[in-house]
Amino acid sequence: MNKVGLAMLLVAALLSSVHTRPHNAWEQKCSHALEMITKGRELLKDGDVVLRLHNSRASAIIRDFNRVDKSYSHAGVVLMEGGCPMVYHIMPSEDNRKGIIRKDSFLQFCNPAENTAYGIYRYQLSRKELAQEKIILQQWFEKRIAFDPLFDLQTDERMYCSEMVAKLMLRLFSNDFF
């Protein structure tokens, strides 16, 4: 057998041993989750509220505060930027409790390696309300609103995720929201 034939045989053997499907259950789960996130990403519009359930112990505790629906532990609001959905949200940083408002891509926000579920909720916002929502979120982002570890509703200088969403909706809909 000549060198070219031997090389082709080796390449064929190598290619036949490569798997294109995930090898184990965790990889299959992540693959399915990424597919679901991709489908969700295609549905997103400005103003959508995105919810998620992080797989940490702290998220399980936070989730249990909800008396009605314990499906999620964190929330953010979508603004499309260059056709890409960015999720504005507030959470403590990983190394300390002094996190600030941030914007992450939808894929990063819902990362299946760190989260077990996500949901999308859409309010029926007018163009005027959407424009106002963008202004408010961008102002909060520029102000670098800090995470509020005390969960104090009396100030807008510090907020936690669901407080940010609620206060945003209150500004858009006034007191008719609740």
Question: Where are the language model's segments positioned?
Answer:
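N-terminal accessory segments that precede or flank the first globular/catalytic domain
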Residues: 20-81
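Bacterial N-terminal signal peptides
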Residues: 7-13
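Glycine-rich catalytic cores of cysteine/serine-nucleophile enzymes that process amide/ester linkages
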Residues: 54-120, 147-155
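Membrane-targeting and insertion segments and their boundary/processing signals
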Residues: 24, 46, 50, 107, ...
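N-terminal signal peptide c-region/cleavage motif recognized by signal peptidases
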Residues: 15-17
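Active-site nucleophile-His-acid catalytic modules used for acyl/amide transfer and hydrolysis
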Residues: 61, 116-178
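Positively charged n-region of N-terminal signal peptides that target proteins for export
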Residues: 1-4
